[in-house]
């Protein structure tokens, strides 16, 4: 198995592993990230899996292509995904739009839009997240935040609450050990000297820079050491806009 496939498996949350927190991060203030979506996935092999995602329109969620499955249920308005609140909205996915150039082996073009069967109701607990503008090429050096329901560490016990962590955009050379990394369509994120990273279960979650979604969590090294690779949203705005316009 190549390095990229192994890394992808470690970001995707399988049925045999409990979800936990982002590594080196902190628990979000409840409902301070109202656009966050927890994805309950039935895979093509009928296993249960999970990813993160985020609401960009009342009827569309953006996530990673490797989070695709036989069926997906989206949970909105959650902080602790095991503790039901009045803010919760559970919506079924009507259609999964995987990027036509998605390469599972190389983990390229790892982006997917989910059209919901019903429109979400916008409330204090459920809202949408703005996306990076077309071809807004955010440079290395910016400090951003990753958000998701991933694990705290490779062997840490699980937590079910939404987490966030500060991560700095790196120069592309920092991701040269990922042989298929493409700077034009991906972001290299996280200081290699700090153990702050996304991990298993964070796939599909956003990278937020000044309140704008700039990236989508894709993969990381199996030992969870930074940097991580995120899909660069600005590169895909024409495709995103086309799907939203036609559906």
Swiss-Prot record:
Leader sequence residues: 1-19
UniProt GO cellular component terms: cytoplasmic ribonucleoprotein granule; cytosol; extracellular region; extracellular space; secretory granule
Biological process, per Gene Ontology: basement membrane disassembly; cellular response to glucose stimulus; cytokine precursor processing; extracellular matrix disassembly; midbrain development; peptide metabolic process; positive regulation of angiogenesis; protein catabolic process
Disulfide bridge map: 51-67, 144-209, 175-188
Active site: 66 (charge relay system), 110 (charge relay system), 203 (charge relay system)
Expression sites by tissue: Mast cells.
Glycosylation sites: 80
Entry keywords, A to Z: Disulfide bond, Glycoprotein, Hydrolase, Protease, Secreted, Serine protease, Signal, Zymogen
Enzyme kind, highest EC tier: hydrolase
Reactions mediated catalytically: Preferential cleavage: Phe-|-Xaa > Tyr-|-Xaa > Trp-|-Xaa > Leu-|-Xaa
Domain spans labelled Peptidase S1: 22-245
Superkingdom of origin organism: Eukaryota
Subcellular location(s) of the protein: Secreted; Cytoplasmic granule
GO molecular function, one term: peptidase activity
InterPro entries: Peptidase_S1_PA, Peptidase_S1_PA_chymotrypsin, Peptidase_S1A, Trypsin_dom, TRYPSIN_HIS, TRYPSIN_SER
Propeptide: 20-21
Protein EC: 3.4.21.39
Job description of the protein: Major secreted protease of mast cells with suspected roles in vasoactive peptide generation, extracellular matrix degradation, and regulation of gland secretion.
Family classification: Belongs to the peptidase S1 family. Granzyme subfamily.
Annotated protein name in UniProt: Chymase
Taxonomic path: Eukaryota, Metazoa, Chordata, Craniata, Vertebrata
């Amino acid at each position: 198995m190549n390095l990229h496939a192994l890394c992808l498996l470690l970001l995707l949350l399988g049925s045999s592993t409990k979800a936990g927190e982002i590594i080196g991060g902190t628990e979000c203030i409840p409902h301070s990230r109202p656009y966050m979506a927890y994805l309950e996935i039935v895979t093509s092999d009928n296993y249960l899996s999970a990813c993160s995602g985020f609401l960009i329109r009342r009827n569309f969620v953006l996530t990673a292509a490797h989070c695709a499955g036989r069926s997906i249920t989206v949970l909105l308005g959650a902080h602790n995904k095991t503790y039901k609140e009045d803010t919760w909205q559970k919506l079924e996915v009507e259609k999964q739009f995987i990027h036509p150039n998605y390469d599972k082996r190389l983990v390229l073009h790892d982006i997917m839009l989910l059209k919901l069967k019903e429109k979400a109701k916008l409330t204090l607990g459920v809202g949408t997240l703005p996306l990076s503008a077309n071809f807004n090429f955010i440079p290395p050096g910016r400090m951003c935040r990753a958000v998701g329901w991933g694990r705290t560490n490779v062997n840490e016990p699980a937590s079910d609450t939404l987490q966030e962590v500060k991560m700095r955009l790196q120069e592309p050379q920092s991701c040269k050990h990922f042989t298929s990394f493409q700077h034009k369509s991906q972001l290299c994120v996280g200081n290699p000297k700090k153990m702050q990273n996304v991990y298993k279960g964070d796939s599909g979650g956003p990278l937020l820079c000044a309140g704008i979604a700039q990236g989508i969590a894709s993969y990381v090294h199996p030992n969870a050491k930074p940097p991580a690779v995120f899909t660069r949203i600005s590169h895909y705005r024409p495709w995103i806009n086309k799907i939203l316009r036609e559906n």
